């Protein structure tokens, strides 16, 4: 049965979420409308509030309800360390899983000329100004290991070098608990090349 009107619009709207295809979107829609209208109202209100209140941090470009995020506003963070990530989700992952005490800069994407994403779309003019003026001693590149992520890392490394800022790249390789026989060749090669003293 083909849906029309408001139901079809809600199904299509839910498909914008990562990992949500047409069947999952339809199940979500029908659940919210049939069984949990209160939750649907709360979801609608929470989304409206977030859209109204949440924007980008003026300094690092992560999501925040204030002009500066909790990291940039904190006087206890090491301002000489600047970690570059592709998305706000990575800020949360690094903060939750590591002892990192420096600042972040969120690209909200990665260089991808074929998709029309260049340095301007990633706020690299803002980053370059920070490298010039903010006393950054080390730029930590934590972009993904995709082709675009690697190209972005090289571009940022060149930028940092022009300003005399040390650049490091987070290690990539074998996941903790992983077995070598199941690791792809490129990952194994990268891990082998990045070995360190033990």
UniProtKB/Swiss-Prot annotation:
Q: Where are the zinc fingers (C4-type)?
A: 57-72
* Highest taxon listed in the record's lineage: Bacteria
What are the UniProt keywords, alphabetically? DNA damage, DNA recombination, DNA repair, Metal-binding, Zinc, Zinc-finger
Which SUPFAM superfamilies does this one have?
A: Recombination protein RecR (SSF111304)
Any one Gene Ontology biological process term? DNA repair
Q: What does this protein do?
A: May play a role in DNA repair. It seems to be involved in an RecBC-independent recombinational process of DNA repair. It may act with RecF and RecO.
> What is the protein named?
Recombination protein RecR
